[in-house]
Amino acid sequence: MAHSAPKAQKRETFSGRRAFILAAIGSAVGLGNIWRFPYTTYENGGGAFIIPYLIALLTAGIPLLFLDYAIGHRHRGGAPLSYRRFSPHFEVFGWWQMMVNVIIGLYYAVVLGWAASYTYFSFTGAWGDKPIDFFIGKFLKMGDIKNGISFEFVGMVTAPLIAMWIVALGVLSMGVQKGIAKVSSVLMPVLVVMFMVLVIYSLFLPGAAKGLDALFTPDWSKLSNPSVWIAAYGQIFFSLSIGFGIMVTYASYLKKESDLTGSGLVVGFANSSFEVLAGIGVFAALGFIATAQGQEVSEVAKGGIGLAFFAFPTIINKAPFGEVLGMLFFGSLTFAALTSFISVIEVIISAIQDKIRISRGKVTFIVGVPMMLVSVILFGTTTGLPMLDVFDKFVNYFGIVAVAFASLIAIVANEKLGLLGNHLNETSSFKVGFFWRLCIVLTSGVLAFMLFSEGAKVFSEGYEGYPNWFVNTFGWGMSISLLVVACFLSRLKWKSETKLTIDETKGE
């Protein structure tokens, strides 16, 4: 009898709505909010960009957030188990999402290590008067990828990389409430306070108004350019942690009576509010350095790694109390990256734990230690930066966008949206209906355009001048391998104690 009707293990839960919201915001607010949004806004019409950005948030970001919440909460499992309980044919999407998180986790840790190192460097001034030369030549000791992959390890990179892995795995081993929720409940308020102080400080720097003018002056002509709208949808999609298993996993830890849509609205608008705050702080600081150097903002404005590790050290060198500015900026970057990194690894831990039914401590070790070693081998060397660049590009477009597009098409084609909508409406304050379903369908089209247009561009032009063998192996090869491994994992049997179906009226 015990084998015919196995009793499922009791799933961990967040203590309440506040704990979940802070953890979800912690996942969503990451590197992209601080170093991607400001420059994306500046490049795509300034103040005018806010219009497509808000439309993207309301028609894609929040609807997809609701969808992820419904899948995870209704089916009470990590991504693979939730999709398996949704439909046996959908299980592969969950494993595909898990594999995307494996790749992201491998390289996200190294950027987290960089940010932590630069928090310390803010006080020592290690980068001197030439931050670019220091970052490329002394910190990364960057080699030429055209000469092949290097296995020459860089101590300044590997030591903080390993340290960040140990911190994250320590948090994850403590569980959902005692680990993830507690850390998020501390780091997120601290992050907001630190960044508010940074913004206020930046606004009082000479030339701050010049930077804000550059950021917010609208170029309305940009709104007729389709690439601007795609940039808006891309920013929302990549910054909200939607479509690749994180929010499915976190929602599965909610108690059965939870306000899903209300929480989703809070998370969605909190994430966007932080992005706007980041834009103000970053461009006020860029206005200062442009004024100090007698340049235009366009000459100093950068995004991504260039903003964080080239532009900001220069700003810190020239700003009054620059050490404080550096601590606030790189400390914020570290905290934001850490909570996002934890959420990425949790997707993998949850998936494996559901599959083989062993303790959280054991599965954290089984997942974490091999990933840490691979992370060090790939990104702790002199060719770590080009490896990171290619991994990030391909896993975003041909991992995240690809699996989101495929899973949405499957859900819509199999007429499952109504089922998820009903689940959302059972416990939520904000009800969904036809408009929500329409947004999901239309978002599928946007994702298809993003996927195929970017695929055609990279296929015909290559990527950033990297050698074909490198892009084909670690770009296209990696992307294809994610789906291949996902198909293999979906064929493996589940542990007999794993309950693969749910009560359609009550859930697990």
Swiss-Prot record:
Its main location: membrane. The keyword Transmembrane helix applies. SUPFAM superfamilies: SNF-like (SSF161070). InterPro entries: Na/ntran_symport (IPR000175), SNS_sf (IPR037272). One of its GO terms (biological process) is sodium ion transmembrane transport. It is a multi-pass membrane protein. One of its GO terms (molecular function) is symporter activity. It holds the Pfam family SNF. PANTHER family: TRANSPORTER. Putative sodium-dependent transporter. This is Uncharacterized sodium-dependent transporter HI_0736. The lineage of its organism: Bacteria, Pseudomonadati, Pseudomonadota, Gammaproteobacteria, Pasteurellales.
